[in-house]
């Protein structure tokens, strides 16, 4: 999809860009694949705030996505490409030969009318899902499982992809988008191709109200708060932080502080850490 630019008739529109949604072929979702999605506004079951900057936003319904791709040996036809308000990628509605309908993440290049399938015998073409042991080295993949049968967890957002680097015994080496090289069980599944909607990262929101439509509330800097509200707060004028490192609102070191647990069982599966940016 291409980006649309707007004439600067107001300050909010001056730098605003949107996607033209040229790839979207149907605007009404499949009713049988919808579920209610109540708003939480960042609160837990006790009503306490657990996630900041959440609240408001347009009403949404959840689209049930098939991340497992476990309907083997049955050809599915791409019925439509649709917008999903719950993720950055578009979704594709598949209609299987037996009449069942499922949503999948729409990879780059998938067109209405094309056929896809899943299983060890599937061809190596965009949209097909196979076990990693059946995917050739060098293939670009997305929607990668970490545990067999659990469903894809890696490389699911717009433009995301990973690459098969090699095979060692019961493991397959995968290079993730972050640069990390990781071993994943060869019986885990992945889908061929790169996730579509590559232009998503180039969209300029343009105004605060557009973030509010998405359910994103303002992010206030700690340095402009009072000292009882944030460790960075207080002082006369533009005061420095006054601590060895930046702190979270709860006094924990942040901005560069490692948050991964020291000894994690999956550490032995990471061949090379992610690149430093």
Curated annotation (Swiss-Prot):
Name the residues that span the membrane: none
The alphabetized UniProt keywords are: Ribonucleoprotein, Ribosomal protein, RNA-binding, rRNA-binding
What SMART domains does the annotation carry?
Ribosomal_L2 (SM01383), Ribosomal_L2_C (SM01382)
Task: State how it assembles.
Answer: Part of the 50S ribosomal subunit. Forms a bridge to the 30S subunit in the 70S ribosome.
Q: Annotated region Disordered: where? A: 211-277
> What organism is the protein native to?
Staphylococcus epidermidis (strain ATCC 35984 / DSM 28319 / BCRC 17069 / CCUG 31568 / BM 3577 / RP62A)
Gene3D superfamilies membership: 2.30.30.30, Nucleic acid-binding proteins, Ribosomal protein L2, domain 3
Please state what the protein is called: Large ribosomal subunit protein uL2
Q: Per its UniProt record, what InterPro entries does this chain match?
A: NA-bd_OB-fold (IPR012340), Rib_uL2_dom2 (IPR014722), Ribosomal_uL2 (IPR002171), Ribosomal_uL2_bac/org-type (IPR005880), Ribosomal_uL2_C (IPR022669), Ribosomal_uL2_CS (IPR022671), Ribosomal_uL2_dom3 (IPR014726), Ribosomal_uL2_RNA-bd_dom (IPR022666)
- Does the keyword section mention Hydrolase? no
């Amino acid at each position: 999809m291409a980006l649309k630019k707007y004439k600067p008739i107001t300050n909010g529109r001056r730098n605003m860009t949107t996607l033209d949604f040229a790839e979207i072929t149907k605007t009404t979702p499949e009713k049988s694949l919808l579920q209610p999605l109540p708003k939480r506004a960042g609160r837990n079951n006790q009503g306490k705030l657990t996630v900041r900057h959440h609240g408001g936003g347009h009403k949404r319904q959840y689209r049930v996505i098939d991340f497992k791709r476990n309907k083997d040996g049955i050809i599915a036809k791409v019925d439509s490409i649709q917008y999903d308000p719950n993720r950055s990628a578009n979704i594709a509605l598949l209609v299987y030969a037996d009449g069942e309908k499922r949503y999948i993440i729409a990879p780059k290049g998938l067109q209405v009318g094309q056929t896809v399938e899943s299983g060890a015998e599937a061809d190596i073409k965009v949209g097909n899902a196979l076990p990693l042991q059946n995917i050739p080295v060098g293939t670009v993949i997305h929607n990668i499982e970490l545990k067999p049968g659990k469903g894809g967890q890696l490389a699911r957002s717009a433009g995301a992809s990973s690459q098969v680097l090699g095979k060692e015994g019961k493991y397959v080496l995968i290079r993730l988008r972050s640069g990390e090289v990781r071993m994943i069980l060869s019986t885990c599944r992945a889908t061929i191709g790169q996730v579509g909607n590559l232009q998503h990262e180039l969209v300029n929101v343009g105004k605060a109200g557009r973030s509010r439509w998405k359910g994103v509330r303002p992010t206030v800097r700690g340095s402009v708060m009072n000292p009882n509200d944030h460790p960075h707060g207080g002082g006369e004028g533009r005061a420095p932080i006054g601590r060895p490192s930046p702190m979270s609102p709860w006094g924990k070191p942040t901005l560069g502080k490692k948050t991964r647990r020291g000894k994690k069982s999956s550490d032995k599966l990471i061949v090379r850490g992610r690149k430093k940016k």
